[in-house]
Amino acid sequence: MDLLRLSRLFSGPRPIGLSVLQHLDLVGSTRWTGGREGPARLRAAFCGSSSPLPLGSGNQKEMSSLCSDSSKLSTVAPQEEAEEESFGSLSGKFSSRRIFHKSTAQLYNLQLKEQGGEEEELEPRPWRGRRNTQYWYFFQCKRLIKEGKLAEALDLFERQMLKEERLQPLECNYTVLIGGCGRVGYLKKAFRLFNDMKKRDLEPSDATYTALFNVCAESPWKDSALQSALKLRQQLQARNFQLNLKTYHALLKVAAKCADLRLCLDVFKEIIQRGHAVTEETFCFLLVGCIQDKKTGFRQAMQVWRQMLSLGIKPSRHGYNLLLEAARDCGLGDPEVASRLLLTSQEETILLPPPKGRHMAGRKVQAKTVHGVSLRHVEALERQLFLEPSQKLEGPPALPEARVTSRTQPEVETTAEPGHTVALTPLASKPTHLELEVSLLSLGTLSPAVVSFGTVATPADRLALMGGLEGFLGKMTEHGLQPDIKTLTLLAEVVEPGSTAESSLLSVLDRHRVEADVTFFNTLIRKKSKLGDLEGAKALLPILAKKGIVPNLRTFCNLAIGCHRPRDGMQLLADMKKSQVSPNIHIYSTLINAALKKLDYTYLISILKDMRQNSVPVNEVVVRQLEFAAEYPPTFDRYKGKNTYLEKIDGFRAYYKQWLKAMPAEEAPHPWQEFQNKPVGDQDTTDKAGGLRDG
């Protein structure tokens, strides 16, 4: 019978036995999970059952107690929920508060907006588009960087790939972005990407380090970029990381652009010690380091060039262009030192003894040779490059006697002036500049008539030491090279103004079949304007139109150099307006400079009036120019009597004071502003160079 009663408990549409077991389980638990209907349903199952059970007295007592317990649970739970859901019943809990914060609906709405903005930043919208791979993002970023869209590439990587798709980036994703930052010198962002790369436990490749050194070389802040590059180099040396030749060239580029030639030679020695082959590109970076020395850079560049030729390395067109840049920007240095180093043969200069105190160190150097280059050659070249005038008597014997005097030549006369040495040539038969052909570009022995250098002060003089226009182009032809438009533009800058060589440049263009551009003609226009030949500069404009070249703002700026008269300057501004070209601050600055040279204050006021009419913002350069124009001469005495100059400068000072208050100011843009997604002010701009994260 007990089994029959037990089966009845678990039979029927609502088994009572299961309800009892559920109730017993829930009583033993600490939390009711059945909701509000649970206690009522349990009580109905036990107490509202229509089928009486023939149980014993003990069982009936237990059932009645269960019904009473369930009724208590059903009455207590709704009361607790009512207390929790009721409003205004919490005053008893907070009756002891003494301080209350004032709040309004507007403040609450602002708090909700701020919380909503933070949630949007912390939790970006889920990506609902097509799922892409890391390599797809690599090629997309590479394409955008080639198109000059670095900001779009960074946004694609940081927002879409990392935040929206939440992909784990690879090493190539970081390397391509660091390389893009290297092209524009965005140093801070490049090292941020590099540090984030290390945080993700990604191993940088050789291309990554090459891109990092390249971004240091292209940074606008050279000092901080050099410190970052040296710190990275120290970390690589501490890890005994072997750099390849491309990475060494990037490091050599940093040393050439941000440091000096000594650091370049230090990196050059390390390249040889690591067993890398020295190429023409290596020597090109050494030439860039020579150009940084404006005083003796041309002499050092010629020494590096001759060393490269002695090793049998064929030069490139880029190397010839660097020589022209050295002739344009750098000097020869001490003429006596230059004569001793450049007018002697390569065999004599390569064996110069080391300075005092370095004899023992020179003996311990291993003669490690890589493709014809040894440390001994590099150290000898270093001693020649930094030879001081006080060391010139400690070298090999003096110049051969045949170079000073000739048996068939009469006695020569020498004159010495401070700072330079004149050429030692016979007075009776002194050759002219065109008759004496000199070219330091070759390793052959020069003519015995060339004894020493004379005055080498202008770029045209330095070009003459390389054979002149035709001699320079002839050397390029010997190496199988043809000049490009950059070569001819540099030649236009270094040839003598107004000479036959300058007038023959247009024929050289046609002879070598080089297509001219606006930069080439701007160079010719600027040179004629500096000579005061404004009409000659304007005569080049029809040639531009004949070749289908459209003048740009720099063309008008070069024309403004020669506008020394007020009517020329005002006519130039009128012609620009007719051509629908708006004059910018650079054109006005050039006109102000031309007026300052003539001290024409009427001309200055006319320029300022036109500048105010066009609402051109003023920059710092123009303000410095006008402040200088508003100053009285140091020897000027206003109390000696009436002076027309005083009246003019006083009138200009009065107008300039009112003009400056009404003019808008030009804000200098940040070099990295166009590549940042956020404004520059929102970021820390004090650390301009970024840096490396230790570890």
From Swiss-Prot:
Localization, UniProt: Mitochondrion; Mitochondrion matrix
Keywords from the named record: Mitochondrion, Repeat, tRNA processing
Basic and acidic residues bias spans: 685-695
Residue span of region Disordered: 391-416, 672-695
GO cellular component: mitochondrial matrix
InterPro entries: Pentatricopeptide_rpt (IPR002885), TPR-like_helical_dom_sf (IPR011990)
PPR repeat segments: 133-169, 170-204, 205-243, 244-278, 279-315, 316-352, 470-485, 517-551, 552-583, 584-618
Record-linked Pfam families: PPR_2, PPR_3
UniProt-listed PROSITE patterns: PPR (PS51375)
Gene Ontology annotations of biological process type: mitochondrial translation; tRNA 3'-end processing
One GO MF term attached to the UniProt entry: tRNA binding
Self-association state and partner proteins as the record states: Associates with mitochondrial leucine tRNAs. Interacts with ELAC2.
Known role: Mitochondrial protein implicated in negative regulation of leucine tRNA levels, as well as negative regulation of mitochondria-encoded proteins and COX activity. Also affects the 3'-processing of mitochondrial tRNAs.
Entry's family note: Belongs to the PTCD1 family.
Protein name: Pentatricopeptide repeat-containing protein 1, mitochondrial
Source organism: Mus musculus (Mouse)
